[in-house]
Regions:
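Short, basic (Lys/Arg/His-rich) helix/loop patches that form interaction surfaces
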Residues: 69-75, 190-231
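Conserved tyrosine-mediated DNA breakage-rejoining catalytic core shared by Y-recombinases
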Residues: 46, 100-136, 151-152
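N-terminal DNA-binding recognition helix of tyrosine site-specific recombinases/integrases
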Residues: 9-43, 93
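Catalytic-site neighborhood detector that most strongly recognizes the C-terminal catalytic loop/helix
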Residues: 58, 115-119, 233-258
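C-terminal secondary-structure termini that scaffold catalytic or DNA-interacting sites
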Residues: 142, 148-176, 258-284
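Alpha-helix N-cap/helix-start motif at helix boundaries, enriched for small hydrophobics
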Residues: 24, 96-99, 229
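Short, polar N-cap/turn motifs at the start of nucleic acid-interacting alpha helices
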Residues: 104-110, 203-204, 224-243, 271-279
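Basic, Lys/Arg- and aromatic-enriched nucleic-acid-binding interface segment
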Residues: 39-95, 99
């Protein structure tokens, strides 16, 4: 299927490709039901829809503190760090949503925006470190809220890449050029995060997906219900959230099993007078 191959070439993950194809199939099926498309010719018949478990992407508190507290000179590396932390502070806001965020989306102490991927409206409280980042770049990147959709201005600096065009065709071309610039800038920021990871001596390279997974994992560790985490991330179902957290849940189960079965290799526990030691299951 050409569209699927196009999405893969764009670098989208298997899960994201499956998401877009399933939405397209739903539109096609509705068109068939309402008589806008012929029956008996299903273009999705040979397309296999699958969802992969994501590898561990969350980072621990030590890494977060190291990244947030790193003393960096003004420049692109500091911008990349600020964008990573902004995503964490915004409940794991997706990079594409940060790119298109505008000052009008900021109302007092909250950010109100709609996820570009699923159209889900979200409201995020602005905490002090997030406010500091927004204030730092507000004037530089207006009419955007964060310095992602930027392009060199030919004078040694950068300017926002705004959509232009006086007619629909011209505006459409400009939007396509803007999106291409977004993809190029996303690649640049990922390279900067890899460089920052090496500089800080991190075991794994940071990515913006890590910020999203980290928020979800920390929330789950704090005992926040799955339904709340799912809504906070803007997922349309808890199934997607569970993909994020499967590895964390598996680790908690392993820890529980270690506690339950620890008597096998603890001779002291076999004595009648021995009291159970270690963590309680309720503490996991």
């Amino acid at each position: 299927m050409e569209f699927r191959d196009h999405l893969v070439r764009e670098g989208l993950s298997v899960n994201t490709v499956t998401f877009y194809l399933s939405k397209l199939r739903a539109v096609y099926n509705r068109a068939v039901r309402e008589g806008f498309a012929p029956k008996g010719t299903d273009p999705f018949e040979s397309v296999h829809f699958r969802v992969e478990k994501t590898r561990k992407l969350a980072v621990d508190d030590t890494v977060l503190r190291s990244v947030a507290g790193a003393e960096l000179p003004r420049g692109s590396l500091a911008v990349a760090r600020d964008l990573f932390m902004a995503s964490v502070y915004c409940r794991g806001m997706a990079f594409v949503d940060m790119a298109y965020l505008r000052p009008r989306d900021i109302e007092g102490d909250v950010i109100r925006y709609r996820r570009r991927k699923v159209g889900q409206p979200l409201t995020v409280k602005i905490i002090p470190p997030l406010r500091a980042i927004l204030d730092r770049y507000g004037e530089i990147c207006s009419p955007f809220a964060l310095p992602i959709l930027m392009v060199r201005d030919g004078k040694g600096g950068f300017r926002p890449f705004e959509v232009s065009g006086s007619d629909p065709a011209g505006k459409r071309r400009s939007e396509q050029e803007q999106y291409k610039q977004y993809l190029d800038n996303r690649s640049d920021f990922l390279r900067l995060l890899r460089r920052l990871s090496r500089q800080l001596g991190l075991e794994r390279n940071l990515t913006f997906n890590m910020a999203r997974h980290t928020w979800a994992s920390r929330a789950r560790r704090e005992g926040i219900p799955m339904a709340v985490i799912s809504e906070a991330l803007g997922h349309t179902s808890e199934k997607t959230t569970r993909i994020y957290l499967d590895e964390l849940e598996a680790r908690r189960i392993d820890e529980a099993n270690d506690i339950v079965t620890s008597f096998w290799d603890d001779a002291e526990r076999k004595k009648p007078s021995s009291a159970p030691a270690g963590k309680r299951l309720s503490e996991l």
